[in-house]
Each structure stands twice: as C-alpha cells, then as structure tokens.
Regions:
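Membrane-helix interface segments
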Residues: 16-18, 109-111, 115, 200-205
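Central hydrophobic cores of alpha-helical transmembrane segments
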Residues: 21-26, 201-215
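Secretory targeting signals
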Residues: 25-90, 118-188, 192, 196, ...
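Alpha-helical transmembrane segments of multipass membrane proteins
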Residues: 192-193, 213, 217
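Single conserved hydrophobic/aromatic residue that forms the stacking wall/gate
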Residues: 226-238
C-alpha cells in the first residue's frame, strides 16, 4: 500500500499537469498582487480616521485576494473547478487507455491502486486550489501590515469562525484554506469516479466544473425564490 501511494504521489507531483495548474493559479494570485495590492500601498492611510472606530489603515485582511470581493477572486471561483481536475483527476482514464491499469489488475493490486490513486488525486487537487490563495496572502503580507479584526470591522459577525478572526486573522484565513483544500479534493474525487465510466478525458475534467457551476446557480435561484416568497414581502405594498 505504502509503495503504491508513493508511486502515485511521485507521478502526480512530477507531472506537467500539476505544474500547469499551479502556474495558472499562481499567475492569478500574482496578478491580484500586482494590480490591486501594490497600488494600494501608497494609499495605506487614506481610509483611516482617528475619530471613527471602524476605520483602519490599509491591511492584509482587506487587501489580499481572499479578503474582499475583487475581479481576481471572482475569476478564481470559476476556474478553480478546472484547476483541481487538471493535475491528476483524469489519470485513471489515461492509465486505462495506456494499458497500465491492465498490468496492475493482472498482479491483483487494483484495489490498492485505487486507494493510492484517490489519495494522490485528493492531495493534488487541494494543492492546486490553495496555491493561488496562499501565494497571494504571503506576497500581500510582505507589503501591508496584518491587523486583527475587531467587532466594528467584521464583515459578518455571525459567519463561521468569526471569533478566530478576531484573535488571529492569518490563522482564520489558513483554516478556510484547509476547508478549500478538503472540498477541492472531494470534487476531484468526483471526477475520478466519473473516469471509471467515461470514454473521454475532456468529459472527466470538465463535468465536475459544469456540475458545480450549474448547481451553484440553481441554489442561488432557489434561495432568491424563497426570499421573494417571504410573507412580509408578499404583503408589502412597496
């Protein structure tokens, strides 16, 4: 088992697909740093007013790619479903086509191979998803100060882990990256399961993207209908 896992991880991390995904994601994180963060350094005190409790100087929390709504994070939220399937999610399909899987099945190691494959797909997907955010956060921390939230500055004090955000905003960001890592691995696992039946590599890599995007739109639409159908809104004359 351990030997097979090492082989699959070696194949995954030395493949050009993972490097391509990390390069594309890294360019997105770097683009935000160059276009958004660096220009904000010269205006670091513009939003600070000593008499206003909620005002703060320019800081990492509000400026890094995952801190506030910006063009780069919107792009990331769309392309991340492709970034996580590029590295290794379709490798079962390619192994089956190349005959590697047949050789493994003959040796009676297919179940071990599937476990090792799943672990490698999970880890590479998480790395691909988190790398742009981690790179951008580290770059932003080199030019802007880290300021911990207080209750006046919380974007949503009812959100998950807000107490942690007040104590240590960097740890708070890292916790969310861990969650992104896990969900990315699970979604890539969906692509791996599809490769058991699909006969096209493009389908294996793109179907999770389509499923996530379409389901996200449907949930948003459903929630909007629920919001519109609230009794207070139905009875409102405005």
């Amino acid at each position: 088992m351990g030997r097979m896992i090492r082989i699959e991880l070696y194949r995954a991390f030395h493949g050009k697909e993972l490097k391509t995904a990390m390069l594309l994601g890294g360019l997105l994180g770097l683009a935000h740093f160059v276009l958004e963060v660096i220009p904000s350094v010269s205006h670091i005190f513009d939003g600070y007013h000593p008499d206003i409790a909620s005002s703060v100087v320019g800081n990492v929390t509000e400026s890094w790619m995952g801190g506030m709504i910006n063009a780069e994070i919107n792009i990331y939220q769309m392309v991340v479903f492709l970034l996580i399937t590029i590295p290794y999610a379709a490798s079962y399909y390619t192994d089956r086509k190349s005959g590697i899987l047949k050789n493994i099945a003959i040796r009676g190691e297919k179940s071990i191979y599937m476990v090792a494959k799943s672990i490698a797909v999970f880890i590479t997907a998480g790395v691909s998803a988190v790398f742009p955010l981690l790179l951008n956060l580290m770059l932003t921390m080199t030019v802007l100060p880290v300021i911990t939230y207080d209750w006046y500055q919380l974007p949503n004090y009812k959100a998950v882990f807000m107490k942690l955000a007040i104590k240590n905003v960097v740890v708070y960001s890292l916790v969310y990256m861990i969650l992104i890592f896990v969900f990315a691995g699970l979604i890539a696992g969906l692509a791996l399961s599809l490769s058991l039946y699909a006969n096209n590599r493009f389908v294996v890599m793109s179907l999770p993207f389509l499923i996530c995007v379409v389901s996200g739109r449907l949930v948003t639409y459903a929630l909007s209908l629920i919001h519109i159908s609230e009794p207070t809104r139905l009875l409102s004359i405005s």
